[in-house]
Amino acid sequence: MNTFALKGTFLDTPAPDTLRVREGYLLCENGLCAGFSETAPAGVEVLDYTGKIITPGLVDLHLHAPQYSYCGTAMDLELLDWLQQYTYPEEAHYADPAYARLGYSYFVRDLKNSATTRACIFATLHTDATLELMHQLRGAGLSAFVGKLGMDRNSPDSYREPSAAAGLAETRRWLDTCRAGKMLSGWTGDRDN
């Protein structure tokens, strides 16, 4: 059993419109929060963060990693215009492994340095770039669900898969590679479910 306690100033919101600030110890057992105490638990290693604020991590349920480089831009455009002018041209660059590696390195670095501890992340339709993102997230110690996109219509030729069958084949290749690399927790290997 991996047990330790964090000592510090804890902030949380136990109810809407309620901010709680407490000094004390958070007992952690096997990666789970097991309890809070104002006194140090006996016989447990204490990691002392006195003077530091400790908060619950945030979960981002909808992130597009390849869009990170231009987030907050062109807010005057409607969605479809924004996709055509910004998103599709940028995401097409992720076919280049070196471009994907560099672009995702900025995204992963900044995500790691944020309060986000878990995320659901969209990559691109490029299998190898999607695997690169997953590799970087794992290397940074971040936990995420990552999705490979599939597109065979309603986007420019530079950013679409040649056909639905080709997209399915690439998605299977992505899943098989993830499974072989043990990147899918709980994956059963049943392609029909």
Where is each model-derived feature located?
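Short secondary-structure capping/turn micro-motifs that flank functional sites
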Residues: K7-G8, T127-D128, R153-N154
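Domain-wide signal for the mature, well-folded portions of proteins, strongly enriched
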Residues: T9, L19-V21, Y49, E90-Y94, ...
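Divalent metal-coordination and catalytic microenvironments
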Residues: T9, L26, G31, G51, ...
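Active-site gating loops and adjacent loop-to-helix segments of metal-dependent hydrolytic enzymes
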Residues: C71-A100, R153-A165
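Divalent metal-binding segments
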Residues: L80-A129
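Metal-coordinating catalytic core of metallo-dependent amide/deamination hydrolases
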Residues: E132-N193
